[in-house]
Amino acid sequence: MQAALIPDKNKFEYQSPEDMIRRIQTTVDSGSADEYFLYFHGVPHGYLFEIDREFSTSKLRYSVRFTTENSLGALICRILPGARHLALTYTLSMKIGLKIRAIPGHTYRSIDEFSGMRFDIRNIRSKEGHEAFVPATRSKRDAWPSMNAWPSMDAWPSMMLEVGYSEALDFLRLDAKWWLINSAGKTRFVIIVQLMTDPLAIHIECWAMVTSYHRQTIKAPTLIPTCVQLFDIDTEGTVTSASSELRIPYGCIFDEPNENAVDVVFTNAELTSFALPMFSLFSHDF
C-alpha cells in the first residue's frame, strides 16, 4: 500500500477539512521535494464530500489528488508539483489523444479525456488520476461539447496516464497496479511517466494485465499487472529501450472491434521529439 512509502512525518490524524487544508498549504509553501504525499488516517466514512466542499473554496483543489481506502479510514493526498508537471502531462496526453482520433473510423468524439476525475468502487475505495482516457461509448457525453456533460462515475477509463517526479516512481507503479486491478478489467493500459531531476531525464513505463502461469499450481492462469514496455530518455534525446516503439494496442483503448483498427504507436524518434522541448522547459528550473 502507498501508505508504507510515506514517511511518518507526513502522516497525520484527521481533524477537520480546515486542518487538512492548512497542512497541505504548509507543504506546498515549503517546496520540499520529499513531501508530495500526505497520509491522513481516522477520516470518517462519508466525509469526502465535506472535504471536497471545503477544498472548493480554496486555491488548492487543482493542486491535489486524493486516494481513499474506506475500510482503513485513510486518505492519501498527492500534491502536484506545479506548472512543469502540468506541461508534461498536458503535452503527452494531447499527443496521445491526437493519435487516437486519427485512427481510421474515429473522430474527436471517439474518446474523452478528463483530468483529476474521481473513480469510485462504491463504499470501498476511490482514486483521482492525472489523465483519464474514456471511450465515448462509456462516457455517453450526448451533450458534447458542453462541459456540463460529465460522464457517469461508472465510466471507468480504458487508459490512464500518471506523471510524477524522481521520488514518485514507486507510487506511480502502485498507481498502475491500482487502476488495472480495481477497475475489474475496464482499465487495460496505464502509462506512467517519471521526470528525473538528477540527472535530468524522462522515464516511461507502460503497464497492462499479463497472463501468469504459476508452475506450482494447477489452477487456471491468472492476470497480473506487469510493466510491458520501458523507455529512458536523456537530455540528448537518446531513447534507451528494448522496444523500437511505444505501442498502445487498439483493444486497450476501445471496447468495440473496428475493421480499420490500428494500434497507437510512438516511434523512438517521436518520443525524442516529445522529450526535448520538455527538457528545454525544465532546464531553466534545475
Residue ranges and their predicted role:
Residues 1-286:
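Gly/Pro/Ser/Thr-rich low-complexity, intrinsically disordered segments predominantly at protein N-termini
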